[in-house]
Swiss-Prot record:
SMART domains: BACK, BTB, Kelch. Pfam families: BACK, BTB, Kelch_1. Residues 135-237 form the BACK domain. GO terms for molecular function: ubiquitin-like ligase-substrate adaptor activity. This is Kelch-like protein 30. Keywords: Kelch repeat, Repeat. It comes from Xenopus laevis (African clawed frog). Coiled coil: none annotated. Kelch repeats lie at residues 274-335, 336-386, 387-431, 433-480, 482-522, 523-572. The keyword Repeat applies. It comes from the Eukaryota. GO terms for cellular component: Cul3-RING ubiquitin ligase complex; cytoplasm.
Amino acid sequence: MVRNIDDLEFCLPSHSDAILSGLQTLRFNPRLSDVILVVQGREFPCHRAVLALCSQYFHAMFTGDFQESISAQVEIKEVDPEVMETLIDFSYTGRLTINQGNVEGLIRTSNLLSFPAVRKVCSRYLQQQMDATNCLGIWEFGETHGCPEVAAKALSFLQENFEAVSQEEEFLLLSPERMLCYLGDPLLQVRDEQSRAKAALHWVKQDKECRAQCLPQLLSVAQLSSLTDQYLQELMEVEPLISESEVCRTLIGKNLGQETRGLREQSPVFLQEVLVVVGGKVLEEEEEDEDEEDEETQRTSANFAYYNTKTKKWMAFPDFPDYNKWGFSITSLSNDVYVTGGSRGSRDDSWSTRQGWRFVLNEGIWKPITPMINPRTNHSSASLNGEIYVIGGTLQEAVEVECYDPYSGTWSLISPAQKYVSNFTAVGCSGKLYLIGSCAMKYNALTLQCYNPATDGWSVIASPFIPKYLSSPCCCTVGGSVYLIADNTKKVYMYLPEVNLWKKVQLLHTLHENGGMTSVGSCLYVTGGHWHGMARDYSVVMESYDCNTDVWTRQGPLPSPWLYHCTSTIFMDTSRWTEEFQGQPEAEL
């Protein structure tokens, strides 16, 4: 007998894969399979146990008191044999190829036969493929086939991109009922108040004979009362569909003159795009004998505001509850503002947080969201395809990325960027996530990386004329182009993804540190502080850039001397928030 030998725990890592692979091969041997699925005349030999593990439908069928539990053959009705074959192969291999041609069939069948893993990945695939050309069809599909998360994100995409969607073929194919529903949605985000009326006319002109009778009803929900008298008069004079319809003329006539009579305030709610800022640390005098009262005042100074680009005023929002932070990041999604990460320690002794907050615009309150998987400071965040991505800012030697699904309230890790960068910015543009940055080493050239959410894959883009080293870069998008600035130069760069080309635009008026850049309509808004003069005065200022005229315009100071802040944009009813923001005056050291 063998003595004095230690136990050995043996595990063959490839065993489970080998078993499944072997079962996939052996199932075609009639002696080694135990059931045959028959779909429209095609036969698929299988193992009951494998199907039951992957499908709740088959689990109930084979373990319940049904005839199918003992039958050698089971007929599956209302299922495409090609899709059935794909699902069976997935059950044995765990692999699945999803494309435009099979995704609808896979979702439909995985719902019917309860393959939750397949349904989930197909749902995400549809959400990541969404754009202006297909969001309406995806919305219809999600509604019809019991995918509420898909329908919700498609509707959100439509609301945020109505003007682009209204130019696509799917929009012109809408039924009158759907058209009326979409056009009357009070949450549509339109940058041009004429967009609803233009969309209604565009749709009717696709089939004048059949659709002209729908125009009065469509115009009745097109918020005509928010339009100028000049535009309404032009419609009456130059648009035959209106001038030749007594009902339309009457409808237009009722709204003429409201502008001069001051009745615009009684018009339906019109969502206006505004700039929002969340402030962190505020400039304070460096005095060692600062008393506790001053510290408490500093800690609770107002820190959340929006800028109305029409009135040129800063208005107050309810304070962000986590005062005096730095290193956090903000983005907006469905007109709610999300703040992630950051630190409240000093820059020499900082501690990052996993915290996330959401300002729910409709309720006017801040709510915590599910904490991130990793703590992050000095990271970037971006919204893309109805989800939020947070990039970098961890202590790892890799650019770790997480994705937040607001529908399920969950975070998930995605593939890290291919190349490590520590000095970076990120933005979503045309269905992709762009990461622009370099290592912290001085004069290290920038790298452009692109993430495709549909494939969960990153690529490094070799781009001609990419800018050299930039300190603390910051970017945003306007009209499908990416604009890039930094705090060490007044130069402004524009990247055109369609042609993979960089070019320079007009210089900034001043440098901006620890600020942000966002877009409102066709204009960029850049914020941030700078030191000036012999007295070392510190100013936090804003300037705007008109992308159509290539001109920068100074917009004055921010309402508080924040040493750190972030900006974004949302659409909102400005009549709801009318209190001017009371910040701190600019200070000097």
